């Protein structure tokens, strides 16, 4: 809206300036001014008639502008004149836009009458204000400089005789100008004094804003200028509609008031004010105008054609509007933007203004603008300089004319109805035709001169404008009318014999009101309107700036020509051929629009009602459907609940279940219980019939073996050794020998000599000449291969001199893939010596050859392709052979060492050997000895009739006692009686002691230092014997040589002298000789006695003999006789030469022995347990065999003292075994090779076992067995009394225990049941094991086949094993339990498990109480059987 108001302000300013300048130029007198006012009044009265002529103006103006007479040179004017010319050009164009609107409103006039009459009163009030503002602006802008400008223009116009049409229109211009000024003066007289200061405030900001906008938009390019011209024209057309309404008001005032010459304006004062204002504005912007003028000059040169055309159209329309609408005082802010409008501006259709928009636009025109006043001067100076260079105006005029012509065709169709019924229009058309005909004759003489001008300026036209000029070239000569002549004739005819009284004032007002809102935009298509209105707002300011570049002369000429052409060409516009098509449609629309609207409203209401009903219906349907769904869900829920209840009852009854019940894979009903639907049953049956898809086994891709390069190097190219390949594999190889024979190698030294001696010329012939000769290969000759000696050849052929081996190329070192961490300073480095020592600790030296043998055997077996079972059997046989070899080697080594020690016969050597054996190597057993423990146990209970000899100290120390247990060790080492238990088949034989008859009386003088101490009971000895981890059964030849060996062992216990013991053990080992056994023994004993006498002076120590006491099961069996033992001569007792089995202990761990337990006791116990086994095997041994065995074994074993036990490091301790790289070990029988990391063994707590009360049986009880031994007594009824198969305890436990406790109790019951099952099966398993081993032994003796002797032997051996008491009990229990396949745990045991295992005695007692109470109630109820029967019958 603001841009529209600015355009309106510019129009008035430019129009008045143009009129004033023409008035001063001609110097008209006062009378002429009055005549002009009279003419203006007349024109105002006939304003409606001239409005009808308007729609054809654009076409007429185009014809006139295309005529060659319009190409007149425009003189160069100064800046002030250019400013006035631009003002007039803009004003005239804007007024023409205003006149385009009324025609369109002829059709819609009836619609706007009510709105216009309502606003008339308000607009009249505004007119007086605007008139006052306009007058003040004219006084300011059109001051004294206008006189000087007009004088200059007169002088310059005399130098240009070509513009002879200027003088013709001066009189008309003056008349019109005076009419306008008079109307302004009359409107403003009443309120001039009140509104004057207020209007000054409004004008100043408007000037700033317009000048600011124009200066900014000057810089835009040519394309933007063309687009902006459309917007400008639309806004001007809007403003023109306002001016027409105000003109109607002024017409009323003029008819009521007489015209007074006294009210005319003083033109000299107006010019002075204008000059004064322009000078002040120019001073402030002097510096800026220079740059902007240069820019505008360049822009205007590009847009000259467009702007010239716009100027012509603007002047034409402005002059015509001035004729028709007396004094347009609509937009009084005159000094707003003075910029030019582009050529496309007038063509663009503006928005159609409504009755509401018009007063708002008028009011907003007076809002203060913020643009500074300096910019107004800037734009004026720019446009004035650019206008001086405008020489291309005719060419540019043709473009806008053509566009006007095209658009007015549409306008004519819309305005045909208005022309049809208007008689006044027809009369005016005839009059104009007459004027045009007369003017054609006068203007025909000017065509020749204007053609020359058009040709000279055609070079400057733009490409776009040249297209339009060529199209209009044919009509240019036809329409070359003199606008000046047409206007003069038209005015003369219009105002001839016309009086103001003849016209009815109401008719004029109605006609003006009908045309008030008509604009060009109403005649254009709406799609063009919408597109152009979007562009109109932002580009309006730039378009107003582009008109000032056109010279004053061109604008004058254009205005005259346009006005004359428009008046003459109007009558030819209305065309009736197309009137019927459009008007019929519009008439029908107007006729039936009310009926159609009424029908549409009725139909709309019906549709609303119908839609409402449909929505209600849909809502009800949805609601019913929702209720149905809910009901179905509820029924389904109830059905499922009923089915669940039914199925629960079925499940509680137990199997068999119905076929449609869902079951798990195990056959139990699946929760939640559900039946299969018929569809699911059908599907399951079909799936069962279908064959199952066989899953394809994915074949694992075999990984390609990576052959190392070192192996590839070793592959020979040719196998020259014929016998190297097996005959079976010869057919797989290629024909290597055949290929070698074709090569022609020289295999003899003669051939090599010939190669060296042959001339070079024979090189190419030599291989072929000697290839047929057979040569032998000499392996001693080496071929030195160089790369250059082997010529290049195809790979499928053999070179002339092939090498015997490939050259070995140097290879780059392959980087180590495995990255080792940097060794830190704190890391422990293990040396080779350390690894060797740790290996020796873990693996004794005796086992290394065995292990290497086993490894080699395993490698050979696996290399041969044997299966793991075959390799295992092979290694088993090797281990069996290794056993016997190791036993033989160990026996031989010990025998040799004993013989060497005996031959030397020195106690020092014996002491050193004993000290060496104190720290033996840790031995790892090669074979299993797990049955040794059982063999030890099975012999102890059978021997209950053993006797014991205890030594007593003599009361008289001086008297020697040959039968006493203590002797003098200083004189003899062998004259000591050693009490030994001789186990014979006879249990009543008293114990004997072996003594020597040669005892000197001097021995009685020595004192006895120690008293024999009794040994701990047999139970301790048996337990310590069991704790030793391994026992080896070794065969030893006892009868090879009779020898006696004395071993000195010391037992030191915490340094206590009381516990110190010096034990002399006499263990003569005799070799029986068939000829003289007694003699041999006697001589040996005498020799040993003489050796011991020599050692007596140095030792000076008392020896004490320790008697081993063996006790049976009963304490009464211990014999404590103090009588003299019977001497038995060794020579009298026959000795057997058989080789008995003697068990020797090789400890894996250091035995855990109490300090008071001596080694000799252990040895004697072992011997005593093994001798009966030997006797059972029908081996005849001497009575002194136990003595021999115990002495021999004691010599082998080292002494174990308390300090040794204390200082000994067990394997349990945390010892780190560090190894860099573990030795590669074959994974035999699933054994995992040791890892390379340090393995820290977990420290095990040594468990001390308590001795059981019965010494014959070893404690085998488990931890859980011990816990079961603690039992409580519970008084609950037996299952027979309760008469229930199920456990009553569990039934009552559910009420007392939580779920977790109940599940735990069930687990404990299960564990006890399983443990009992294993115990019951262990005896059976032992029986099967014994029978299978006996069968293996029988197969070795009797062969694989079955025979009576074989089965009889197996049965006998088995009965011998079973006859022992230990196994009798087991067999009896197994026989009783054989029938009971189930292991039943009764209720009392369950309560014990709850009390002991779960540590919950209180709840066990509560359950016991509950069971008793329930049992009592049942008994009471059973006393009344009749009532129960009646109830049951009724029930």
Swiss-Prot record:
Segments of this protein annotated with the region Disordered: 16-74, 88-265, 286-309, 322-424, 442-482, 519-708, 934-972, 1005-1125
Parts forming coiled coils: none
Residue ranges annotated as motif Nuclear localization signal: 683-699
Keywords, comma-separated and alphabetical: Isopeptide bond, Nucleus, Phosphoprotein, Ubl conjugation
Subcellular location as annotated: Nucleus
Comp. bias intervals (Low complexity): 384-398
Domain UIM: 171-190
Bias kind Basic and acidic residues: ranges: 53-63, 98-127, 139-154, 196-205, 224-234, 345-355, 524-548, 610-628, 637-652, 676-691, 1005-1014, 1033-1082, 1091-1103
Cross-link Glycyl lysine isopeptide (Lys-Gly) (interchain with G-Cter in SUMO), sequence positions: 981, 1154
Broad class of where this protein is predominantly found: nucleus
Tagged with keyword Ubl conjugation: yes
UniProt biased composition (Acidic residues): 27-42
GO biological process: negative regulation of gene expression
Residue stretches of biased makeup (Basic residues): 211-223, 235-249, 367-383, 665-674, 692-706
InterPro entries in UniProt: HMG_box_dom (IPR009071), SPP41_DUF3020 (IPR021386), UIM_dom (IPR003903)
Annotated Polar residues bias: 286-301, 442-451, 459-482, 1021-1032, 1108-1123
Modified residues (Phosphoserine): 1014, 1067
Role summary: Negative regulator of PRP3 and PRP4 genes.
Subunit annotation: Interacts with PRP8 and RAP1.
Descriptive protein name: Protein SPP41
Species per Swiss-Prot/TrEMBL record: Saccharomyces cerevisiae (strain ATCC 204508 / S288c)
Name of encoding gene: SPP41
């Amino acid at each position: 809206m603001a841009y529209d108001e600015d355009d309106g302000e510019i129009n008035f300013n430019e129009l008045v300036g143009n009129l004033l300048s023409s008035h001063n130029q001609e110097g008209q007198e006062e009378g002429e001014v009055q005549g002009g006012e009279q003419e203006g009044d007349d024109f105002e009265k006939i304003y409606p008639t001239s409005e009808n002529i308007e729609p054809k103006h654009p076409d007429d103006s185009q014809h006139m502008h295309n005529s060659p007479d319009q190409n007149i040179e425009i003189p160069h004017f100064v800046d002030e004149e250019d400013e006035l010319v631009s003002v007039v050009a803009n004003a005239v164009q804007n007024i023409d836009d205003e006149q385009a609107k009324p025609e369109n409103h002829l059709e819609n006039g009836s619609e706007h009458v009510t709105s216009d009459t309502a606003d008339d009163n308000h607009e009249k009030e505004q007119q007086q204000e605007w008139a006052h503002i306009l007058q003040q602006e004219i006084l300011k802008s059109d001051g004294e400089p206008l006189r000087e400008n007009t004088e200059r223009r007169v002088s310059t116009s005399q130098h240009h005789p070509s513009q002879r049409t200027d003088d013709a229109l001066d009189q008309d211009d003056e008349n019109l100008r005076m009419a306008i000024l008079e109307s302004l003066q009359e409107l403003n007289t009443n309120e001039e004094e009140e509104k004057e200061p207020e209007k000054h405030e409004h004008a100043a900001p408007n000037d700033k804003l317009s000048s600011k906008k124009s200066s900014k938009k000057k810089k835009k390019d040519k394309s933007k200028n063309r687009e902006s011209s459309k917007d400008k024209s639309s806004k001007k057309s809007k403003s023109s509609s306002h001016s027409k309404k105000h003109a109607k008001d002024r017409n009323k005032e003029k008819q009521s008031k007489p015209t007074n010459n006294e009210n005319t304006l003083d033109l000299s004062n107006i010019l002075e004010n204008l000059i004064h204002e322009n000078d002040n504005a120019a001073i402030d912007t002097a510096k800026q105008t220079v740059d902007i003028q240069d820019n505008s000059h360049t822009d205007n040169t590009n847009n000259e054609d467009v702007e010239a055309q716009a100027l012509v159209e603007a002047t034409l329309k402005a002059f015509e509007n001035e004729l028709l609408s007396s004094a347009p005082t609509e937009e009084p802010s005159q000094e707003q933007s003075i910029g030019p409008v582009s050529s496309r501006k007038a063509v663009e259709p503006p928005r159609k203004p409504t009755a509401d928009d018009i007063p708002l636009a008028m009011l907003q025109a007076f809002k203060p603008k913020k643009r500074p006043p300096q910019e107004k001067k800037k734009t004026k100076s720019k446009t004035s300089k650019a206008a001086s260079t405008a020489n291309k105006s005719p060419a540019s005029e043709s473009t806008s004319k053509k566009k006007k012509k095209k658009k007015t065709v549409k306008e004519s169709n819309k305005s045909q109805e208005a022309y049809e019924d208007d008689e006044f229009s027809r009369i005016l058309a005839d009059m104009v035709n007459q004027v045009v005909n007369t003017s054609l004759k006068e203007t025909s003489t000017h065509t020749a001169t204007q053609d020359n001008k058009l040709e000279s300026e055609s070079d400057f036209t733009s490409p776009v404008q040249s297209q339009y000029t060529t199209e209009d070239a044919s009509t240019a000569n036809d329409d070359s009318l003199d606008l000046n002549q047409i206007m003069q004739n038209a005015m003369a005819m219009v105002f001839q014999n016309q009086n103001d009284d003849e016209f009815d004032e109401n008719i004029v007002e109605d006609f003006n009101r009908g045309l008030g809102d008509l604009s060009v935009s109403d005649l254009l298509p709406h799609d063009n309107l919408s597109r152009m209105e979007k562009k109109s707002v932002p580009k309006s300011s730039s378009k107003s700036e582009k008109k000032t570049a056109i010279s004053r002369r061109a604008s004058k000429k254009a205005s005259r020509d346009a006005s004359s052409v428009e008046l003459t060409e109007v009558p030819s516009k209305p065309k009736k051929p197309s009137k019927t098509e459009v008007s019929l449609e519009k008439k029908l629309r107007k006729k039936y629009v009310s009926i159609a609207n009424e029908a549409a409203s009725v139909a709309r209401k019906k549709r609303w009602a119908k839609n409402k009903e449909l929505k209600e219906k849909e809502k009800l349907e949805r609601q019913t459907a929702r209720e149905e769904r809910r009901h179905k869900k509820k029924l389904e829920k109830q059905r499922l609940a009923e089915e669940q209840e039914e199925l629960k009852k079925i499940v509680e009854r137990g199997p068999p279940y119905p076929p449609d019940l869902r079951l798990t894979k195990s056959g139990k009903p699946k929760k939640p219980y559900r039946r299969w639907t018929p569809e699911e049953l059908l599907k399951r049956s079909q799936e069962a019939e279908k064959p199952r898809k066989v899953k394809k086994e994915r074949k694992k891709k075999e990984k390609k073996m990576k052959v190392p390069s070192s192996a590839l190097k070793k592959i020979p190219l040719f196998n020259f050794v014929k016998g190297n390949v097996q005959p079976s594999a010869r057919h797989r190889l290629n024909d290597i020998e055949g290929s070698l024979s074709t090569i022609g190698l020289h295999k003899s030294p003669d051939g090599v000599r010939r190669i060296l001696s042959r001339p070079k010329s024979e090189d190419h012939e030599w291989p072929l000449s000697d290839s047929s000769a057979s040569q032998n290969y000499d392996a001693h000759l080496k071929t030195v291969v160089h790369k250059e000696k082997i010529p290049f050849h195809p790979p499928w052929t053999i070179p002339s001199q092939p090498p015997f081996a490939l050259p070995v190329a140097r290879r780059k070192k392959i980087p180590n893939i495995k990255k080792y961490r940097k060794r830190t300073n704190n890391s422990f480095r293990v040396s080779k010596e350390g690894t060797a020592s740790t290996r020796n600790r873990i693996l004794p030296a005796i086992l290394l050859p065995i292990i290497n043998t086993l490894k080699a055997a395993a490698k050979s077996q696996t290399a041969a392709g044997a299966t793991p079972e075959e390799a295992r059997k092979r290694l088993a046989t090797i281990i069996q052979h290794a056993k016997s070899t190791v036993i033989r080697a160990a026996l031989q080594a010990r025998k040799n060492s004993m013989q060497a020690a005996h031959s030397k016969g020195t106690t020092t050597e014996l002491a050193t050997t004993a000290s060496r054996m104190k720290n033996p190597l840790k031995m790892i057993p090669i074979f299993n000895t797990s049955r040794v423990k059982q063999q030890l146990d099975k012999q102890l209970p059978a021997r209950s009739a053993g006797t014991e000899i205890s030594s007593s100290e003599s009361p008289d120390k001086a008297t020697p006692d040959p039968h006493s247990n203590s002797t003098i060790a200083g004189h003899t080492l062998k004259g000591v009686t050693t009490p030994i238990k001789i186990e014979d088949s006879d249990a009543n034989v008293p114990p004997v002691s072996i003594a020597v008859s040669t005892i000197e009386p001097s021995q009685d003088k020595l004192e006895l230092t120690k008293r024999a101490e009794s040994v701990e009971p047999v139970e301790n000895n048996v337990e310590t014997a069991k704790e030793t981890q391994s026992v080896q059964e070794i065969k030893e030849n006892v009868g090879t040589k009779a020898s006696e060996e004395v071993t000195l062992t010391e037992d030191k216990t915490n340094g206590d002298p009381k516990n110190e013991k010096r034990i002399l053990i006499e263990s003569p080992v005799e070799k029986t000789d068939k000829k003289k056994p007694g003699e041999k023994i006697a001589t040996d004993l005498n020799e040993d006695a003489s050796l011991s006498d020599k050692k007596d002076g140095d030792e000076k120590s008392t020896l004490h003999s320790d008697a081993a006491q063996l006790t049976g099961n009963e304490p009464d069996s211990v014999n404590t006789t103090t009588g003299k033992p019977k001497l038995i001569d060794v020579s009298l007792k026959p000795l057997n030469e058989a080789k008995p089995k003697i068990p020797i202990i090789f400890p894996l761990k250091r035995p855990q022995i109490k300090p008071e337990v001596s080694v000799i006791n252990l040895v004697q116990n072992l011997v005593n347990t093994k001798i009966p086994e030997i006797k059972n095997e029908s081996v005849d041994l001497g009575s002194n065999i136990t003595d021999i065995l115990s002495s021999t074994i004691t010599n082998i074993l080292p002494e174990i003292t308390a300090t040794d036990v204390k200082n000994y490091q067990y394997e349990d301790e945390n010892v780190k075994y560090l190894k860099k790289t573990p030795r590669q070990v074959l994974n035999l029988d699933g054994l995992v090779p040791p890892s390379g990391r340090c393995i820290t063994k977990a420290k095990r707590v040594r468990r001390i076992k308590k001795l059981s009360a019965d010494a014959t049986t070893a404690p085998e009880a488990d931890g859980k067995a011990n816990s079961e031994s603690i039992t409580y007594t519970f008084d609950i009824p037996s299952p027979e009394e309760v008469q229930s198969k199920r456990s009553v305890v569990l039934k009552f436990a559910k009420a007392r225990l939580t779920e977790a406790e109940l599940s735990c109790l069930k687990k404990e019951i299960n564990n006890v049941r399983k443990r009992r099952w294993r115990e019951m099966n262990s005896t059976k398993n032992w029986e099967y094991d014994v029978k299978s081993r006996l069968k293996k032994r029988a197969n070795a003796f009797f062969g694989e086949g079955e025979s009576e002797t074989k089965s009889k032997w197996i049965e006998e051996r088995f009965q011998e094993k079973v006859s022992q008491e230990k196994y009798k009990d087991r067999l009896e229990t197994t026989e009783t339990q054989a029938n009971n396949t189930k292991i039943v745990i009764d209720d009392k045991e369950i309560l014990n498990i709850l009390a002991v295992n779960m540590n919950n005695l209180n709840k066990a007692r509560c359950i016991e109480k509950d069971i008793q109470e329930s049992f009592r109630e049942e008994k009471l109820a059973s006393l009344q059987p009749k009532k129960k029967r009646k109830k049951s019958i009724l029930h």
